Swiss-Prot record:
Signal peptide: none annotated. Pfam families: Glyco_transf_5, Glycos_transf_1. It catalyses: [(1->4)-alpha-D-glucosyl](n) + ADP-alpha-D-glucose = [(1->4)-alpha-D-glucosyl](n+1) + ADP + H(+). Its EC number is 2.4.1.21. It comes from the Bacteria. GO terms for biological process: glycogen biosynthetic process. The gene is glgA. This is Glycogen synthase. ADP-alpha-D-glucose binds at residue 15. One of its GO terms (molecular function) is alpha-1,4-glucan glucosyltransferase (ADP-glucose donor) activity.
Amino acid sequence: MQVLHVCSEMFPLLKTGGLADVIGALPAAQIADGVDARVLLPAFPDIRRGVTDAQVVSRRDTFAGHITLLFGHYNGVGIYLIDAPHLYDRPGSPYHDTNLFAYTDNVLRFALLGWVGAEMASGLDPFWRPDVVHAHDWHAGLAPAYLAARGRPAKSVFTVHNLAYQGMFYAHHMNDIQLPWSFFNIHGLEFNGQISFLKAGLYYADHITAVSPTYAREITEPQFAYGMEGLLQQRHREGRLSGVLNGVDEKIWSPETDLLLASRYTRDTLEDKAENKRQLQIAMGLKVDDKVPLFAVVSRLTSQKGLDLVLEALPGLLEQGGQLALLGAGDPVLQEGFLAAAAEYPGQVGVQIGYHEAFSHRIMGGADVILVPSRFEPCGLTQLYGLKYGTLPLVRRTGGLADTVSDCSLENLADGVASGFVFEDSNAWSLLRAIRRAFVLWSRASLWRFVQRQAMAMDFSWQVAAKSYRELYYRLK
């Protein structure tokens, strides 16, 4: 079974979000599971520099100009690169300029990505041809459409990492991307009078996956579907929509081997976690005290992530004696709000604006509770890292958060399945009630340690996801 992942980023070569983490880990897990998985990426500068052994496979003149297809390896995974400097050789973000305006030629830049993905199934590399083209998010959404236009030389899977980003472009660009105008149809890639790369992936793929079972159900509902609910409900009825949970890359996220921690530990040596907490309290300007629970946030500061709820609930958390360490950036109003809280509550609130991958490990190793109060969350990786590190997740019941965290209810504690704290409603009162439950459990140290060990024993490895995808691919053949 030969599978080509078509996508726009891959950790650690280039990362703007969780998609990169998935592509950085899933193909390697699939190779270990017996699938010949490779990755197709645009040759953005950081990616091109990272794949040092790239050799020319093919040269083509395309609707988007001349391209060179390269092939090399990164961490044991075969990587195809679309080398087109006029499209991809730009500093900074792969999607927008320094003023945060989307590049005006994004329609060509990402149509080309889908086109090359489909051409791979027609022999662009004469020595390797995929049985399945697995496209990820809107950037690769045209790959299933190009395959359909070519008579489907390979099966296609389209994975939705976040339905909110739809890849919308003016209709006249149909003239530029070499797809038949007949595809510009409500039964095709047309959406609200425009081309939607996302809808192209949803409509033309043989199978759609979402990054958690709950999110796969949620996106059939109007409040989560952004206008795509009719199509997604149809795909669900046809058995062509399912959810596969993302995993944790244990080579990077494991408290037993994490060199970024002051003190490494396992579920059997959790007492060694205390030194990480002490170091984190010092680094964030918090009072060094192992008797108080340290809550943490590692997140984009947006209302989608529920960070406005944290700001509203913060006085209640602090009144009970808790501390907060926050690492993130985003909405300027939220940034100012958290900075003001740090100034008002010195020793109890520490805030670092920005994102630093290394420091996020130190927070995960040192905190007692990781807050993930998202309004919607397709899968979420932060809570999975929390489980792995014995940093109990406090989450809202949505998307992948609902699939991965079991509340510390009396029943779950008795059954030995509790792993965190879950609240229902997207408001500060509901969040505060969950925070209160965390304080109650914290006051029972042996029970807290029991839940930590239970959380750390859960298996969210990429091997589980790789097996699920392998079974899906074989069903499509």
